[in-house]
UniProtKB/Swiss-Prot annotation:
Domain of life: Viruses
Binding to host EIF2AK2/PKR, as annotated region: 43-53, 74-79
Notes concerning its domains: The C-terminus is involved in the inhibition of host EIF2AK2/PKR kinase.
InterPro entries membership: K3-like_poxvir, NA-bd_OB-fold, S1_domain
Protein name listed in UniProt: Protein K3
Pfam families hit by this protein: S1
Subunit structure: Interacts with host EIF2AK2/PKR kinase.
Disulphide bridges, residue numbers: none
Keywords (A to Z) from UniProt: Host-virus interaction, Inhibition of host innate immune response by virus, Inhibition of host interferon signaling pathway by virus, Inhibition of host PKR by virus, Interferon antiviral system evasion, RNA-binding, Viral immunoevasion
Sites annotated Involved in host species specificity: 45
SMART domains in UniProt: S1 (SM00316)
Length: 88
């Protein structure tokens, strides 16, 4: 297990960050975890026309997201915005 494993969020945590686009996927710069970024899982699965609408709505905004998956060995964090919206 790597040293930074203890500084990553757990699945089910709600975290806050700013959305940006990179390589046709939406990522989130995490405010509480400054050395890590998370990927919005639903942005990868979308068709391009729906993705463009989704991107225009979220890029540059500060949002709360729910952590759905964490790979502690690689430092990958997958988050979901839709699940967070349903709970609010």
């Amino acid at each position: 297990m790597l040293a930074f494993c203890y500084s990553l969020p757990n699945a089910g945590d709600v975290i806050k960050g700013r959305v940006y686009e990179k390589d046709y996927a939406l990522y989130i710069y995490l405010f509480d975890y400054p050395h890590f970024e998370a990927i919005l899982a639903e942005s990868v699965k979308m068709h391009m026309d729906r993705y463009v609408e989704y991107r225009d709505k979220l890029v540059g905004k500060t949002v709360k997201v729910k952590v759905i998956r964490v790979d502690y060995t690689k430092g990958y964090i997958d988050v979901n915005y839709k699940r967070m919206c349903r709970h609010q």
